[in-house]
Amino acid sequence: VKVAYYSPLPPSRSGVADYSTLLLPALRERIDVVVAEEGKRAPDADVALYHVGNDPDAHGWIVDALMKRPGVVVLHEYVLHHLIAGITIGRGNGRGYLDAMERDLGVAGRLLGLGVLDNLLPLLWETQPERFPLSGVVLDQARGLIVHSHYVGERARSAGYEGRLWRIPHPVWPHGDVVPATDVSGDPLIGCFGYLNMNKRVPQVLEAFASLRRRLPGARLLLVGAAGERFDVERRLERLGLTEGVQRLDYVPEERMWSLMAACDVLVNLRYPTMGETSGSVIRALSLGKPLLVSDVGWFSELPDDVVLKIPVDELEVALLDRALEFAVEHGAALGAAARAYVEREHALPQVAEAYASALEVAAGGDAVDDAVLWRIAEAATEVGIDDAAGLARAAIDAGIVS
């Protein structure tokens, strides 16, 4: 089978770009893959594979290609409101945005969209994206769907997707022996990696860490990642008296990130609300055998209880986070061993690549069968004098004879 592969790739600062850099070599060992390039002619292939995330800069051109040729979609996160707004409103196509809102939410959605376009409502993709996912536009074009979690698969089905669906875990990086960074330290050193904003529960992490540091004065917190535009990290650190206990680093290259993570005693990766994403940072942390704290939501809830410490998002979040940090420090060896064993068993790159290859072979074969059936319908219609062959084809699709 020959696959046209649509994905952001480095130097794009995208988690999906990192994902594809990992997956592509293993996938090419199993099937013929042609990587599509933005602005270039679409490759000839038996089936197209589209990696879709929520960033319009990274994924807008991929959705453009999907609209021209349906194919297998890898849905890296369920909430796509920012993406859809970017490729509609961002291009001066307000009507496209209204259509997407109506597709998911009916007439009420269209009215909400009008409120946004008329500046009567705040930008929904900034204020409440989880309430208005707008993934239906993409799901309608999917001839097959690959997800990383039961959570996203169930939401896709609830949104009306009825086609083929495969759940394929996020692969783990074969990292070998990572040398821990020597320019960061703490007793213990707590690490928090990724974009710093309210959704990543950074305020709650800082509050819990301030409490932990009163008991463990040698503790230090390492924050790695760019901060949101309206998220003033430094001011929060001053208010909590943490200017001496926290080290801040901006975006770092892949190799540097690995070494920083390896230097940490405990890692924290919280988020709420979830957009249905799977976290590459979590997979990295588990593969390093690090004790890890996550929010008890979405895909993170599906991780085994003996592998991660799950923090409920409620009024007890900060208190539980504080105690969980201390527990992770004390039981780091056992938690880390369970984490490493889990990802090596469930997220191994060869088995992930094999699952992709199998899914794409099924999708390509299914498409070929569907095309043959539709061609025979058209041929038979002509033989008996029926002019509306296209109408018969649509009826066959509606009846589930072909997809």
Question: Language-model features: where?
Answer:
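Acidic donor-binding loop of glycosyltransferase active sites
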Residues: 143, 261-276, 290-291
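Glycosyltransferase donor-sugar binding loop
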Residues: 193, 220-233
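Membrane-proximal helix-turn-helix segments that form the acceptor-binding/catalytic region
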Residues: 98-144
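Conserved donor-binding/catalytic core segment of Leloir-type glycosyltransferases
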Residues: 183-200, 206-209, 222
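Nucleotide-activated donor-binding/catalytic signature segment of Leloir-type glycosyltransferases, i.e.
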Residues: 187, 233-255
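Carbohydrate-associated surface elements
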Residues: 151, 171
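C-terminal amphipathic helix plus adjacent low-complexity
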Residues: 340-345, 349-403
